[in-house]
Amino acid sequence: MADEKNDLTRRDFVALSLAAGLAAAAGDTIVAAAEVEVHNVVVKTPDGDCDCAFIHPGTGAHPAVIIWPDAFGLRASMIGMGKRLAADGYSVLVPNPYYRMTKAPGIDMNGFSFQNQADMAKLRPLMGSIGAAGAAEKDATAFIAFLDAQKPVDKTKKVGAQGYCMGGPLVFRTMAAVPSRMGAGGSFHGGGLTTDQPTSPHLLIPKMKGRLYVAVAANDDQRQPDSKDKLKAAFAAANVPAEVEVYKSNHGWCVPDMPAEADKPIYNKPEAEQAWSKLMAMYKAALV
């Protein structure tokens, strides 16, 4: 293990800037939450030292999963998702996507507003650091190499990746960067999955070999109604097994601590649980 160290909307910004525990876990292994271990680790990448949380069951070797955080970075809610996965029998790495510029979390969520230019001036460069060409690909390769070297990871099993908001495109980039190791990827209210740029994440689909589940927010679909069809067509053309599903909830609905927008809560627990259930079913089938 690495050294341990104890008038722009949310969805519009993500698209422009970066372009379920209800099911059983892999195999027959389910562990109690009390048996989950959480470690602060450092993963060395070509661009520096990435601070991460490594979360795994207390005993045994298990399929690995990478969680790409949303724009608010590595924090308690993301670690909570990792603990939930670990309790279902997965070994999970949650990286700080902004390590090139700052330690986690990088952004103070208290009082943050996507309409506040001062807040945005802090966030844009951070998102740009992971959105840069080649950054996520280098990170994904380093993360998987780290995971494959850990005793709690069964490296004979495929790896999963899930991402929220800006993490959705990072899942696509991960799936394409290390296709031989990736078994499944989930994008939840991912921003900018289809653009008119040559770097659009959906153009990476032919490089993928694993399964994908793309959960689309209602307001993202309203803003870009043809995106889901572009994704479905790209998956079909590449013979990549995938499901693209539009939810009734708005962008950010899967993340428990997502700040309210216009005094309305974003997190929608019932639909978040539905999405989690879909993810777990995919992991159970694909991370073998």
Label every PLM stretch briefly.
Residues A2-V288:
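N-terminal cap/leader regions of alpha/beta-hydrolase-fold enzymes
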